[in-house]
Amino acid sequence: MTLHVGAEPAPREEEIAEMADEPRELEFDLSVQYGDEVTGDVRKACPKRKLIAEWIEPALFSSAQLTVRFVGEEEGRTLNDGYRHKDYPTNVLTFAYDPLPDGTVIGDLVLCCPVVEKEAQEQGKPLAAHYAHLLVHGALHAQGYDHETSEEDAAEMEALEVAILAKLGFPNPYQ
């Protein structure tokens, strides 16, 4: 789920194709945070900064300043309730802000560790694959992609996720 705070619309397929042909000299500033509930084995199971960057970079179509925050159920529920009026924790929330004048994307990705772990187990996926998917998903949201506006937008976002994850060596998360 994305919460847009004046964020620009996402680049469309034609623009992405053009960008793919151009040399990419993107800057990526990544900050990683852990909520108070994320300790011990839960924190150890979270992907480390280098891996997070490796998974997000292929999903970036412009320079970005992103914060990835790993939280527990209480903080996840509080954020989801406060911003989406849904009183339960969700796997990932993306807060997208107005880009900088040079087009740099700014956003916060919040991942609720217990929810991510439970979903990975229920879906029979490696935890790393599920985290990679949600980080790519959140990074696309931060750039304006949205799967809730139309079926066409959802299909476009899903296709991008599948292609990016395949480049990273992960299977299609929707199968």
Curated annotation (Swiss-Prot):
Residues passing through the membrane, by range: none
Biological process per Gene Ontology, one example term: rRNA processing
Subcellular location: Cytoplasm
Recorded GO MF terms: metalloendopeptidase activity; RNA endonuclease activity; zinc ion binding
Domain of life: Bacteria
Enzyme Commission (EC) number: 3.1.-.-
Alphabetical list of Pfam families matching this protein: YbeY (PF02130)
Keyword field: Cytoplasm, Endonuclease, Hydrolase, Metal-binding, Nuclease, Ribosome biogenesis, rRNA processing, Zinc
Residues the record lists as binding Zn(2+): H137, H141, H147
Entry protein name: Endoribonuclease YbeY
Organism encoding this protein: Burkholderia ambifaria (strain ATCC BAA-244 / DSM 16087 / CCUG 44356 / LMG 19182 / AMMD) (Burkholderia cepacia (strain AMMD))
Gene name of the encoded protein: ybeY
